[in-house]
Design a protein with these regions (language model features):
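Short His-centered aromatic/hydrophobic patch
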Residues: 96-102
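Carbohydrate-associated surface elements
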Residues: 153, 174
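Conserved acidic donor-binding segment of nucleotide-sugar-dependent glycosyltransferases
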Residues: 313, 322-324, 328-335, 344-350
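Nucleotide-activated donor-binding/catalytic signature segment of Leloir-type glycosyltransferases, i.e.
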Residues: 246-269
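A short helix/loop element that forms part of the nucleotide-sugar donor recognition site in Leloir-type
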Residues: 52-54, 182-196
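Short hydrophobic beta-strand element within catalytic cores of glycosyltransferases
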Residues: 299-311, 321
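Acidic donor-binding loop of glycosyltransferase active sites
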Residues: 258, 275-290, 307
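Conserved donor-binding/catalytic core segment of Leloir-type glycosyltransferases
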Residues: 9, 197-213, 219-222
């Protein structure tokens, strides 16, 4: 009988923010539905302990919260905890997601003779890491029994720095159609009234407000957007990591009254924000430290709410749209291109609505987690034969 027990070792996990944590949660939830016995090991932060405890208590699979490890002694204790759990529970496969999640997964797998599957999101292959970290990282990812990239873009980055695994796959991220779906018009209009959005053309970016998301370039495009669409407003939903800097940019270009930061919102409110927007935007960039956007789950979540997207076409998000059908692509840091694509969609209701409908149909047909997980299931099952 096959051992359908799996550990997922992640660098982050819900209920806190972060694409890797969201991906790990969805993978765990969907594998559980397919009959896998799932245990998640991860740090959990950026939200109150009470919220984390309630989340873990209500989870349908087991979540083991790991504490931050600022010292070598604590790192060793974390490894011992994982190895001991693997010895006791004997999982068939250990999945590692995020750089340190991957490192711990492979170490635990080697010490307990357990198969490993790693997931590459993009941040694991930052080219500016130290030579020592680079060497360890390459060895970890090439030695796994399977390597799954969330985009062809991520695979390209990995292979450009020497990370080549003989059992490599590309599986695009999925969206959760139980959490993201079109809401009734009345509910959306009521939310718009409550938030002061009535009469506005709403441009939305959701996720951690950090450099790689490219908020700055949308803000720099706003002066020209406002000349053509005077009622356009840009909303940045998510933890406001670089809010002060971006407010300075908005002030510099004279659009401070049209740029808004909501801070972190809970999932029910996020659903309302996505439904309330006219277009979703993710103009991500590769930062000076090599941080990149591997795919962009939020684009699929927006599509599940019938929203077209404007994204950077030369990175992972470019693989989350069908150009001209479900969204529009721009070059990295192309303020003129951002202006053109956003104004095109905001000024043409029929085109925008049609693209949103196309995005919805494509996401429902190909990119919900219930469909994506079958590809993971096939790979994991092949490892435990």
């Amino acid at each position: 009988m096959k051992n359908k027990s799996v550990f997922i070792v992640s660098t982050e996990f819900l209920p806190g923010p972060g694409g890797i944590g969201s991906h790990a949660y969805q993978l765990a939830k969907e594998l559980h539905k397919l009959g896998w016995q799932v245990t998640v090991f991860s740090e959990q932060g950026h939200c109150p302990d009470s919220e984390i405890e309630e989340f873990n208590r209500n989870s349908v699979f087991k979540v083991v919260r790991l504490q931050p490890t600022p010292s070598m002694a604590l790192l060793l204790l974390k490894l011992i905890k994982l190895v001991w759990a693997a010895i006791i529970q004997r999982p068939g496969v250990i999945i590692g997601t995020g750089k340190h999640g991957a490192w711990f997964a492979v170490l635990t797998g080697k010490l307990t003779f357990t198969k490993t599957a790693l997931i590459g999101h993009g941040t694991e292959f930052i080219v500016t890491m130290s030579k020592r970290s680079h060497k360890i990282n390459n060895k970890v990812f090439t030695s796994a029994n399977a390597l799954i990239h969330v985009s062809a873009y991520t695979q390209q980055i990995a292979e450009s720095i020497g990370v080549v695994n003989n059992n490599t796959h590309v599986i695009h991220n999925g969206g959760d159609d139980e959490l993201f779906y079109p809401l009734p018009v009345q509910a959306v209009e009521r939310f718009k009234q409550e938030k002061g959005l009535a009469g506005q053309k709403v441009i939305l970016t959701a996720g951690n407000v950090q450099p790689r998301k490219g908020h700055e370039f949308v803000i720099r495009a706003m002066p020209q957007i406002l000349k053509q669409i005077p009622n356009a407003h840009y909303y940045c939903v998510g933890p406001p990591t670089i809010k002060t800097y971006l407010e300075g940019v908005a002030d510099e270009v004279g659009v401070k009254s049209a740029v808004h930061f909501t801070g972190r919102v809970l999932k029910d409110e996020l659903l309302l924000w996505v439904n309330a927007c006219d277009i979703f935007v993710l103009t991500s960039v590769a930062t000076e430290y090599g941080d990149v956007e591997g795919f962009g789950i939020v684009i699929i979540e927006a599509a599940l709410c019938k929203k077209p997207a404007v994204v950077t076409s030369e990175s992972g998000p470019g693989e989350a749209i069908i150009e001209g059908i479900t969204g529009l692509g721009i070059k990295e840091k192309d303020v003129a291109g951002i202006t053109e694509k956003i104004t095109t969609l905001l000024s043409n209701d029929l085109q925008r609505i049609e693209m949103g409908e196309n995005a919805y149909r494509n996401a429902k047909a190909n990119l919900t987690w219930s469909k994506v997980v079958k590809k993971y299931d096939a790979i994991l099952t092949s490892l435990i034969k």
